[in-house]
Amino acid sequence: MHISVILFCALWSAVSAENSDDYELMYVNLDNEIDNGLHPTEDPTPCDCSRENSEWDKLFTMLENSQMREGMLLQATDVMLRGELQKLQAELGRLEGSLQKLCGPEAPSETRLARALDDLLQASRDAGRRLARLEDAGALRPQEEAGRALGAVLEELRRTRADLRAVQGWAASRWLPAGCETAILFPMRSKKIFASVHPVTPMKLETFSACIWVKATEVLNKTVLFSYGTKRNPYEIQLYLSYRSIMLVVGGEENRLVADAVISLGTWTHLCSTWDSKKGHMALWVNGDSVATAVDMATGHVVPEGGILQIGQEKNGCCVGGGFDETLAFSGRLTGFNIWEGVLSNEEIREAGGAESCHIRGNVVGWGVTEIQPHGGAQYVY
């Protein structure tokens, strides 16, 4: 009888535990004796749910809180930026409306216009400052690092550019025209500084072409590039500069051709001059372009031989080394000086100032072939 009651109670407890939400483990001690035929009943011990969280639980809780704070911060920043941008749009809208009013058919008076422009200027400055603050607030650290790196690169480029300009200036001061390996340097204006030319072919000419490369440092009212003269007439042939103009004289000052505003100081310029006695045709060329022509210039004249040909000075005396005028002297550099008997064609003149200019030589005076002697402080440079 006791055993039947015990089995019935155990079965009833198992069924009750299966149908409940919380499973409780019941321990039945079948070895105990039950007095008076009654099954002892005891209340189950309640679960202690207030246990302390583990370290992993604390870590996950901290991560969740951090993500929540970051999300709230981003949301607040987005709201602030959106509000500021809306304000800026409103400001720009007011500016646009003000500009439309200023440009409308009914323009205000000068005072009102000035006041409105001042207001617009101040508003644009305020908007610019606010936009700058927004950009600073929204800038990320990688962008700041990239900006600093870009600034460093720009600074390096500025220094490189300055160095390049210095090198270019140094090279320009020593640069010679294409095909030319030497030039004659006239360091200053002096009656003792010139170069004498000694052609083998006599200078008895009824027609000629003369070309020369010029880089002048200073030009006065008359600065002689080259001159040929005799004791009887020191002005048989002259090519000289007058400030920014170039002049060709044959047989005397009455036969003079002028080309105005064609010379630039400090730069190489290729000059050519031609003359034909038969028709008195005279022409001047600058860098391959015809700049001046004339007819009836020393028509029928013949340039006599036996004179003195010089570069950088005018010979108006009887003897070498005398009769020079300091104010007529050339200062700068000259190269590629050639004289031909005959008139060159347009194409030949362009070739004379081209890539092989110093390798094209005249049949009366040829640069690099005819003897040219520097005097005073004049000297060859390379």
Swiss-Prot record:
Keywords: Coiled coil, Disulfide bond, Glycoprotein, Secreted, Signal. Residues 180-382 form the Pentraxin (PTX) domain. It is found in: Secreted. Its main location: secreted. GO terms for biological process: innate immune response; negative regulation by host of viral process. The keyword Cytoplasm does not apply. InterPro entries: ConA-like_dom_sf (IPR013320), Pentaxin_CS (IPR030476), Pentraxin-related (IPR001759), PTX3 (IPR042837). SMART domains: PTX. Residues 1-17 form the signal peptide. GO terms for molecular function: complement component C1q complex binding. Disulfide bonds join 180-358, 211-272. Glycans are attached at residue 221. The keyword Secreted applies. GO terms for cellular component: extracellular space. Residues 79-137 form a coiled coil. PANTHER family: PENTRAXIN-RELATED PROTEIN PTX3. Homooctamer; disulfide-linked. Binds to C1q. Plays a role in the regulation of innate resistance to pathogens, inflammatory reactions, possibly clearance of self-components and female fertility. This is Pentraxin-related protein PTX3. It comes from Bos taurus (Bovine).
